[in-house]
Amino acid sequence: MGAILGKKIGMTRLYNEKREAVPCTIIQAGPCFVTQVKSAGIDGYDAYQVGIGERKEAKVTKPMLGHYKKAGVAPGYMTAEFDTSMFDGELTAGSPVLVESFTEGEIVKVQGVSKGKGFAGVVKRHNFGGGQRTHGQSDRLRAPGSIGGASDPSKTFKGTKMGGRMGSDTITVRNLQVIKIMPESSLIMVKGSVPGPKNSYVRIVSTKK
């Protein structure tokens, strides 16, 4: 079992024993440190708050700078909370979180923010088919069509699929296999793709299966 934060570096391929090309995502999982220990008695639940990376103090707000100094670690780029059951042993503020907590072949889930694509129509955003391409049609090729009734129900229902901002959603990809771990450089390689662009931050958590 393990949990850690990481930065998506990019994708590559590795070859397995059958000489098959396996697409992999390279994630820089560290340096990570525990920035706060939350307990049920004080906070209402048990969790470890983990930070990643080292940032200039001038780039961090004063409240967050004091938060990091209290833990005795350098300011990071982001923090996230993980359940204490995801870690072996008891950790304290300032404890390092290492990529060695994972094993090769293990199944993990990765959570990140997907690429933002801006305003998109219904064809791109919701896979609508659009209007027919014949019989005098001129401007309905990618139109959404009807969005509601007339006098009944006299409204458009919430959740109706329309054009709008696409992407920038929190996405969790499950059942990804850990292909390779490189502790000396804090790298972890998982089979397949993970959400987000290059240099975006992701959460990696072992599955309980």
Curated annotation (Swiss-Prot):
UniProt-recorded name of the protein: Large ribosomal subunit protein uL3
Assembly notes: Part of the 50S ribosomal subunit. Forms a cluster with proteins L14 and L19.
Keyword hit for Ribosomal protein: yes
InterPro entries per the UniProt record, alphabetical: Ribosomal_uL3 (IPR000597), Ribosomal_uL3_bac/org-type (IPR019927), Transl_B-barrel_sf (IPR009000)
Alphabetized GO MF terms: rRNA binding; structural constituent of ribosome
Region ranges (Disordered): 127-166
Lineage: Bacteria, Pseudomonadati, Chlorobiota, Chlorobiia, Chlorobiales
rRNA-binding in keyword set: yes
